[in-house]
A protein has these predicted regions:
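A broad, low-specificity signal marking well-ordered, structured residues that form hydrophobic/aromatic
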Residues: 6, 18-19, 40-41, 113, ...
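Zinc-dependent metallopeptidase catalytic helix centered on the HExxH motif
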Residues: 11, 100-133
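Short, well-structured beta-strand/strand-turn elements
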Residues: 1-7
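Short beta-strand or tight-loop elements
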Residues: 4, 96, 111
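ATP-dependent phospho-/nucleotidyl transfer catalytic cores
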Residues: 13-15, 19-106, 119-120
C-alpha cells in the first residue's frame, strides 16, 4: 500500500506527521491488480452501531457465503475438497494475513478485516492488512 508522510496543520496548529494512505476501493484493485473495477467483490468486518458486522463494500457476498458453507460442510483432509478451496481462495494471502496479524499483535483484528476477489471465473479471495495500530 502506497503512502506519503505529511505534516498536518489545523487552524494554524501543528498536529504532527500523518501518513496519507491509499484507500482500499475498486480503483485500488484496478490500479494494483489490474482488476475490472466494476467486477470485484470486496467485504469487510467493521464496527457499526449494532456491533461488528460483515459488510459488502463492493459486489456481493454470494461467492464468499458459498465458500464458507463449503468449508463448514466438508472435511479439508480430503485432497479433493482442499483442491476446491484452493480454487476459491489465495491460500498464501490468507496465511500471510494470519502471520502478519499475529506478529504485529494486532488487537483490532476483530473489526478490521477486509478481503476481496476479482469477480472472474478464476478470481480468488485475497486478504488485506488494515489498521495495525
Amino acid at each position: 500500500m502506497a503512502y506519503k508522510p505529511s505534516s498536518v496543520f489545523l487552524n494554524g496548529s501543528y498536529w504532527g506527521i500523518h501518513n496519507i494512505r491509499e484507500k482500499f476501493d475498486k480503483n485500488y484493485f484496478s490500479e494494483n491488480f489490474n482488476a475490472d473495477p466494476d467486477n470485484i467483490d470486496h467485504l469487510e468486518y467493521s464496527r457499526t452501531e449494532t456491533g461488528t458486522e460483515l459488510l459488502i463494500v463492493e459486489g456481493t457476498m454470494s461467492h464468499y457465503n458459498e465458500m464458507i458453507d463449503y468449508l463448514m460442510s466438508n472435511n479439508l483432509n480430503d485432497p479433493a475438497i482442499y483442491a476446491q478451496v484452493v480454487e476459491w481462495m489465495d491460500i498464501d494471502s490468507f496465511i500471510d494475513h494470519l502471520v502478519m496479524t499475529m506478529y504485529c499483535a494486532n488487537t483490532s483484528w476483530g473489526h478490521n478485516r477486509e478481503w476481496w476477489r476479482p469477480r472472474t471465473e478464476n478470481g480468488k479471495w485475497r486478504w488485506l492488512i488494515v489498521d495495525l495500530d
